[in-house]
Amino acid sequence: MRLVLVGPPGAGKGTQAEFVAAHLAVPKISTGDIFRSNVSQGTPLGVQAKRYMDAGELVPDEVTINMVRDRLAEPDASEGFLLDGFPRTTPQAAALDKLLVDLGTALDLVLELVVDDDEVIRRLSGRRTCRGCGKVWHVEFDAPSQEGRCDRCGAELFQRDDDKPETVATRLREYADKTAPLVDYYGAQGKLVGIDATGPVEDVTVRAIDALRSYSG
C-alpha cells in the first residue's frame, strides 16, 4: 500500500507514521531522513541541498522531488511506502503524482490526522524540555514530580521557542495556508480519509489501522 500522511503540527504524524508503517510492513519515508541521508553521503542532490540549507534558504522543490523520486525507486519501496512530511503543498502533490506515474504506480490513500487548533496549542505549548538530558516532559500529560525539574537528571526544564503558544499559532496559520489545500486536492481524487487524532496515541493508531482495513477489505 502506498500512503501519504498529512496533518497539522502537533497532530502526532511522526508517531503514527512509525506505527502504521510497521503494521503494513512498508518503509516510513520522511523528507528529513532523505535530506540527512543525501547530505551525509555527499550525493549530487545532497550537495545541492546543503548549499541552500547552509545559506538558511528553503531547498527548491525540484531538488526535494528528485530526492523523493530516488528514494521511492529503491527496492524496499516497490511494494509500498508511507510518506511523512511530503508533499507539503499542492504543487508538490502534483509532482508526486507525476513521478509515481513515471515509476508505474500511484498513491492508494492519504490519511489526514484531524485535530483542532486549540488541542494542538495545548499539546505543544505544554511541552517542557530538559536542559540537561533533553528529555521532553508535558505539564499536563507527562509532568515531572517536581515542577520545573527533570525527574531523570534533575536539570532545569524550559519551554522551547517553537513550543510557545504564539509560535504554534503562527505554524498553524502557515499550515492552513500551504498544506491544508492538500486536503482538497486529495479529496477531489477520492483518496482522502480523515482520522480523529484526539485521545491516546494507541486509540489514534487503532482508528488509522481500522480505516486502512476498510479501504483494503
Swiss-Prot record:
* LID: annotated span: 126-163
Main localization is: cytoplasm
Pathway in which the depicted protein is active: Purine metabolism; AMP biosynthesis via salvage pathway; AMP from ADP: step 1/1
Subcellular localization(s) per the UniProt record: Cytoplasm
Annotated AMP binding sites = T31, R36, E57, L58, V59, G85, F86, P87, R88, Q92, R160, R171
Gene3D superfamilies the record matches: P-loop containing nucleotide triphosphate hydrolases
Q: What is known of its domains?
A: Consists of three domains, a large central CORE domain and two small peripheral domains, NMPbind and LID, which undergo movements during catalysis. The LID domain closes over the site of phosphoryl transfer upon ATP binding. Assembling and dissambling the active center during each catalytic cycle provides an effective means to prevent ATP hydrolysis. Some bacteria have evolved a zinc-coordinating structure that stabilizes the LID domain.
The entry's family comment says: Belongs to the adenylate kinase family.
Which PANTHER family would you find in this protein's record? Answer: NUCLEOTIDE KINASE
- Please identify the protein, giving its name as recorded: Adenylate kinase
Question: What is the species of this protein?
Answer: Salinispora arenicola (strain CNS-205)
